[in-house]
Every structure is written in structure tokens, then in C-alpha cells.
Amino acid sequence: MNILLANLTKMVGDSGGMAKVTCAFAHEMKVRGHRVSLVYSDVQTGDFYYPLDKDIPAYDIRHYKGKSISYPWYLKVKREFYRTFDKQKARTVNDEFAASFLLDHLKDVLQTVQPDVIVSFQPAASKMLLCDLQTKIPVITMSHGDPEDYFHTYPKEEIPALEKSAVCQVLLPSFEKHLKDHLPNVKTVVIGNAIPQYDVQADLSAQKDTYKILFVGRLSKNHKRPHLLIEAFAGLADEFPNWNVELWGAEDGKAYYKELQLLIKKHHLENRVFLKGPTNDVPSVLQQGDIFAFPSAYEGFGLALGEAMSMGLPAVGYKSCSAVNELIKDGENGYLCDDGVEPLKIALQKIMKNQNLRKKLGWNAKKIIRKYSSFLIWNMWEKILKRYSI
């Protein structure tokens, strides 16, 4: 097959989950003998954070054939004006920009690649392909979160592209229901994210001088919310003097990073809570951990959580968090707690004080996440691609 991946957003230097999935998808399908190309749209130029095989053509429609496209100032003003009272309407300006300035470049990519099937990474890309260009090439629209959001925060003009898609992939069964509730006739398939199945496992049986609670993810205030973990640990630090917290991930704005530093200082945890920055070796980080804390407000799937489970770490998250509340089975491979700092503290405390419980939860975590093995997930994807390709 000749597969085109259309992830029409940033890729350069991006350490986020979507960029990771994009490069993993491209690599896996190439290894399986398929031709793979990537089209993306990035303000910046440069190297990807996650390596892309040098034999996979990558086309940036913002910087295409010697021509760079800047976002016009008048559209920026228009977008910011709308954003003050209607974020959904503000996002329509991005679609307006794409349709006005990027469509010809995308059309040229299609003519160059001539794919048998296109995997679109967002409804905006599907809109450009199916509604604006009206391509007859089958488009499979991926979802990286709860599709319920499509009907509240995404431009309404993108919705018809979902119905025009050959099939819409969702990550979890509950997400399929959300999409079908709004679009009963849309074709759907449930395929989770591929989680590496590690041969090694965190050693939860060892007696250690220092035990670690780990957080891995972007340091974002309203999404990942690592400040809640710091606050929860502040109430546990004296009770558990041989436990520390490590926060791994790129900062998402200097103001919030400073806020985290001040919070650590406020609770006198400078020698107990550490901001470690991003890492290119997540498995090595996870292998040294004892508990994985994931205080997100929402998740599309939770790749970092899945990887922690694969390393055999018990996990703690919030009941209210989408995806997390499906990956964590309360009392089986970790704990789901009510919102707030105190419930998070109690859930962590329960695991911290009982090594046998940690071992049991960690073993179950590794077992439960096996259904998301890369082999099984990519097999599902390859089957779907073959079914809908020209």
C-alpha cells in the first residue's frame, strides 16, 4: 500500500503524544513493507523530536518548494478577537487560513504521492481533504481524545468531514459511543494507542534507600496539573522521609514552571521534589520508579500512563479524567480518586505504605496493558488500511 499520513500541525521539536504516534505509525508501516509519506504544517523548520526514517518523505505545507507561508496579521487579529468570547469560532479562523493559503500545497502533495489511503490526524485535515479538495482517496480520520469535544470546541464546518471519512478511529469504546450519539451513521472502529511492552520491569521488591513517585508529561497547568502532585506530596513528605517525587517533561510556559518552583520552595521540598526536564529515555526513568502519578484533568488516552503500566508501576489518577478512568482499574492496577489534593494524597499514601500492595498492583498493571501491545495495535491498523485503501 501507498499510505499518506496527514498530521497538519507542528512536528518540529514537538515531544507531545501526537508527534510520537505520527513517527511510530510511519516507522511501523514502513517496516511492514508499505510506502509511507507524511504531510504536516509547521511554523518552524528543523528536526523532529521523534526521529523519522530518512527514507520517509515529509512535506511541510507551510514551507513548501521554497515558499514559506506566514499567518497573516489580519487573521491573527480576527482570531484573537473571536477568542475573547467564542473559542470555537476562533478556531474557524485557522481553517480559513488553511483553505486560503495551504490548500494548493496540499493538493500538490496528493498529486506527488498518489496515495492509496490517507490517515488524517485531525478533523481539520479531513475537512481540507474531503470537503475543500473533495478528494476521492479514502480518508481514515484518527481521534486522539474524546470525540465529544468535536461538538463543543471544534469548528462546526469540520463535522461533515467525519461523515465523509471512510471510517473514524477512536481510542476507547466509550469514545465510540460519544461519536455515535451525535453522528449515528458515521463508520467507526476502536483502536487504542500502541504501548511498548517492556522486557524489563520496575523492581518493586527491592529495599531501597529512596523510593520514587514519578510523573511524566508536559508541565501544563490546566491539562497535566503536576502542581496537584506537589501539593499532595507536601502532606506526605514528613510521614515518608525516604520517598521523593520526580517530574519529567518539557515546560509549557515559563510562568507555570516558575509557579511549580515556588510551590516546591513554599513547602520546603527542594531536596524532595525535582523538576527533571524532558527525557529521550522514558523506559530508564520508569524502571527506577515505584509509583506513577498522573493527575490530569483530561486525556485522549494517556501514553505515558500506558508506558508506566507496561513497566509494572502502580498508578494513581482521577476518576473524572477521561481515558485514565478506563486504563486504571481501581484497586486492581492502581487507584482512582475523587478530585482535589486530599483524595490524591490518600490514594498515594495507601500505596506508599504497603510494598506488597505496590507489587500486586504493578504486576496487574503490566498484565492489563498487554492488550495494547504494538504488535496487536499495528495489526489492527494494517487490517483497516487494507480494507479501505483503493
Give short role names for the model-derived ranges.
Residues 278, 297:
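Aromatic "clamp/platform" in nucleotide-sugar-dependent glycosyltransferases that forms part
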Residues 314-318:
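Short hydrophobic beta-strand element within catalytic cores of glycosyltransferases
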Residues 39-45, 216, 244-259:
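Glycosyltransferase donor-sugar binding loop
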Residues 319, 329-342, 350-356:
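Conserved acidic donor-binding segment of nucleotide-sugar-dependent glycosyltransferases
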